[in-house]
Amino acid sequence: MSECGGRGGGGGSSSSSDDAEDEGGGGGPAGSGSLSPAPAASSEGRLRRGLRGASLMARRRPELLCGAVALGCALLLALKFTCSRAKDVIIPAKPPVSFFSSRSPVLDLFQGQLDYAEHIRRDSEVVLLFFYAPWCGQSIAARAEIEQAASRLSDQVLFVAINCWWNQGKCRKQKHFFYFPVIYLYHRSFGPIEYKGPMSAVYIEKFVRRVMKPLLYIPSQSELLDFLSNYEPGVLGYFEFSGSPQPPGYLTFFTSALHSLKKDYLGTVRFGVITNKHLAKLVSLVHSGSVYLHRHFNTSLVFPREVINYTAENICKWALENRETLVRWLWPHGGKSLLLNNELKKGPALFVFIPFNPLAESHPLIDEITEVALEYNNCHGDQVVERLLQHLRRVDAPAFKSLAPDPPARLPDPPLITASPCCNTVVLPRWHSISRTHNVCELCVNQTAGGLRPSSVSMPQCSFFEMAAALDSFYLKEQTFYHVVSDSIECSNFLSFYSPFSYYTACCRTINRGVAGFIDSEQGVFETPPVAFSSLEKKCEVESPGSVPHIEENRYLFPELETSSSSFTGLSCRTNKTLNIYLLDSNLFWLYAERLGAPSAARVKEFATIVDVKEESHYILDPKQALMKFTLESFIQNFSVLYSPLKRHLIGSDSTQFTSQRLITEVTTDTFWEVVLQKQDVLLLYYAQWCGFCPALNHVFIQLARLLPSDTFTVARIDVSQNDLPWEFMVDRLPTVLFFPCNRKDLSVKYPEDLPITLPNLLRFILHHSDPASDPRNLAGPPTAECLQNEAVLQQGHIAHLEREIRKLRAEIGTLQRAQVQVEARLASARRDEHRLLRQQHTLERQHDLLRLHSEQLQALYEHKTRELDEVARKLQELADASETLLTENTWLKILVATMEQRLEGRDGADDRVPPSKARSEHPEPPGAPRLPASTPLPANISSTLASEGSPENRTD
């Protein structure tokens, strides 16, 4: 104690001295009389004094230091646990409900029971599994289509729907789909065959029926022709069922048909079975188990069993690699896809939109399109193709001995004898503008007797397209006939570009205005009737030198003259613009047709269009014409000729949505010529919605429209992303400004690209190019002094007016700048207020969080104390019950002891026994002992003790 006291005393002395120092130091400045001590020195002094005081307190009371450290650690731990990130709260998903109704023929496994689906799949021959997600809009849309297909096929196919989104189902755990819905089909143990076609009931049913019956039975020659003339490629297998119910290779061929459906969900390759050996010989099938791939224009193939193993995968791969596509279906899925882009890059494409029902027994319109495609690509006059065309036309023809293609025979040399030619008179333009002479040529088509179409040799007149081809070749060589200056007829022969059996003869001579006839040819090959050229001369004088009359225009002057089918046959090989033919179902993809120019309110959804990406143009078949074989052939022929009479289709916006009461006129494709060709100066702005620079010019053109009079000047604009224009009016950059002067539309001017588009620059540009003095009509003579003076006065007036307008604009700009400064000041003040309010909001939110935390702590403390009080009350109740039980047992023990004493006394004095009643009276119960009623039974432990003591075994003699 003395040691601790010594330390305490030493500490006290030192502290007193330190305190004295502090007081002296603190009082020094005060007593020094300085009026304004440095704030830095005073703050450092206060900090030093505070630290000294804390150290003295720690030396005097070390237990306080330990308590403070412990309290700080406790606060840090509390802050760590309270401010740490709370665990994520995950709300369990709601249990799934049935996706299909209870009356639906579709078995709905809405809990994702994939194992049960696999179990029932083994017991069915054909099963369709529909994997869906309940939230998926496409799954919901496909639900009715699946039910409709199931209602028609439920007696043959098992339809099972599986919820593959329920997180506790086996389907979600085992399957990882990237999209919904997904349709799988199983044919017994084969599968899955995924269906990726349109989610339409008819298409789904058609695909399911193909899976049910992947092979078509061909019992007769008529059905064989139906099979071979189809636009889809076909594979035939020959099997003899007479010797065996399942001939060798049949099951492999059957499985290969299922493999083709698995790899090509559209089912474009059809598989058929022939059992008649005579019918099989028509397609060069002799041995049972042989497989034949039919191709229309290339050589048909027989599966090479000696080279490739005869397996289902190899047969399917061989058929898909060597198939020949005549007409192809396109199925855009509606999302981002390169499907159309990849097909259009192959060349010009003919898109035919037809309403298609895949469940229909026959498709007459598709048969006509197939006939057009066969004729279009039949370049060599193949006999098999001709026989198939006759079958499509339902023309009776003698049966061929074999439908297999014959080996190509050597073409005979063309004889020198020519058939009767057909001729057309052509007037070439004058070779010089001052020349009064023309070169007149007679162009004839000469067909050799060894041509591919012997029937055309005996024709007295050639077809229109043969003459059109001759003119195409002639115009390419017309430069050689420009300088023929001779009164005699000079003839020359040149070969056709596309046919080795045709050549053309051109006989030309030079004539003056007075010549009215044409003499006979020196070689006597043909005779020419006298022709008057007066009207032709007048026409040539009006037209430009590059304008040449063409024969294809006559077709529209005389529509009753129909072209023969022979001119269309093999046209794909005689033109450089070969078409690929595609079909689209207008019931599903009519929106594409509308974007290509089809009317939206069409009564019959039939439409045809040709799209040529390379030429950046497309053409449409007149919607007023019915879609049939003849119109398609004419449409293709008009596109294929060198000088096509088809007009490029222009797509534009609806002009009715733009009101006329505007400063700037909105131009569309339909109103372009009406606006540009009006008798006013027109300034046209080219813009697009995606052009970022274009909106910045709106205020410039609005001010320009306000400055210039609307009765003599029009400011217009056109959205070139929504409106097509003729090529001569297209531009290669945006924004672009074109100016069309009044009465001189052919002298349109483009605004300089290197000049900024501002209001003064635009005004100078317009004034420069709209000057009436620059009109070519006013350049005939020199202007007079009076005219120049009037023009100068007029220009001075214009300049003064423009200067006044510029001053007004500058004043408006100054006002707007001042208003802008005021608005910016108000915005800055508003931003400061906003920041202040945000800080207040954050402070209130922190206080609210603290109050909520304190409330939660109080609530937790209240619940804890309530539980403790409930526990204490329960224990007190248990003690009370135990005390009452002990008191009862004590009372009975006393009675038992008294009874035992009485019995002991009774044994000692057997002669002087006292009745129990007297014994009880001699030993009264202690006061305060509870008395049991007569009917109260003894406790179980006491009664058992008495019974054991009263038994004869416990008695002692």
From Swiss-Prot:
<feature type="compositionally biased region" description="Basic and acidic residues">
    <location>
        <begin position="904"/>
        <end position="925"/>
    </location>
</feature>
<feature type="domain" description="Thioredoxin 1">
    <location>
        <begin position="91"/>
        <end position="213"/>
    </location>
</feature>
<feature type="compositionally biased region" description="Low complexity">
    <location>
        <begin position="32"/>
        <end position="44"/>
    </location>
</feature>
<dbReference type="GO" id="GO:0005789">
    <property type="term" value="C:endoplasmic reticulum membrane"/>
</dbReference>
<feature type="coiled-coil region">
    <location>
        <begin position="785"/>
        <end position="889"/>
    </location>
</feature>
<dbReference type="InterPro" id="IPR036249">
    <property type="entry name" value="Thioredoxin-like_sf"/>
</dbReference>
<feature type="disulfide bond" description="Redox-active">
    <location>
        <begin position="691"/>
        <end position="694"/>
    </location>
</feature>
<feature type="compositionally biased region" description="Gly residues">
    <location>
        <begin position="1"/>
        <end position="13"/>
    </location>
</feature>
<feature type="domain" description="Thioredoxin 2">
    <location>
        <begin position="621"/>
        <end position="771"/>
    </location>
</feature>
<feature type="compositionally biased region" description="Polar residues">
    <location>
        <begin position="941"/>
        <end position="951"/>
    </location>
</feature>
<keyword id="KW-0472">Membrane</keyword>
<keyword id="KW-1015">Disulfide bond</keyword>
<feature type="region of interest" description="Disordered">
    <location>
        <begin position="1"/>
        <end position="47"/>
    </location>
</feature>
<dbReference type="InterPro" id="IPR013766">
    <property type="entry name" value="Thioredoxin_domain"/>
</dbReference>
<keyword id="KW-0812">Transmembrane</keyword>
<feature type="disulfide bond" description="Redox-active">
    <location>
        <begin position="441"/>
        <end position="444"/>
    </location>
</feature>
<keyword id="KW-0676">Redox-active center</keyword>
<protein>
    <recommendedName>
        <fullName>Thioredoxin domain-containing protein 11</fullName>
    </recommendedName>
</protein>
<comment type="function">
    <text>May act as a redox regulator involved in DUOX proteins folding. The interaction with DUOX1 and DUOX2 suggest that it belongs to a multiprotein complex constituting the thyroid H(2)O(2) generating system. It is however not sufficient to assist DUOX1 and DUOX2 in H(2)O(2) generation.</text>
</comment>
<keyword id="KW-0677">Repeat</keyword>
<dbReference type="Pfam" id="PF00085">
    <property type="entry name" value="Thioredoxin"/>
</dbReference>
<keyword id="KW-1133">Transmembrane helix</keyword>
<comment type="subunit">
    <text>Interacts with the cytoplasmic part of DUOX1 and DUOX2. Interacts with TPO and CYBA.</text>
</comment>
<comment type="similarity">
    <text>Belongs to the protein disulfide isomerase family.</text>
</comment>
<feature type="transmembrane region" description="Helical">
    <location>
        <begin position="64"/>
        <end position="84"/>
    </location>
</feature>
<feature type="region of interest" description="Disordered">
    <location>
        <begin position="904"/>
        <end position="957"/>
    </location>
</feature>
<dbReference type="InterPro" id="IPR052792">
    <property type="entry name" value="Thioredoxin_dom-contain_11"/>
</dbReference>
<keyword id="KW-0256">Endoplasmic reticulum</keyword>
<keyword id="KW-0175">Coiled coil</keyword>
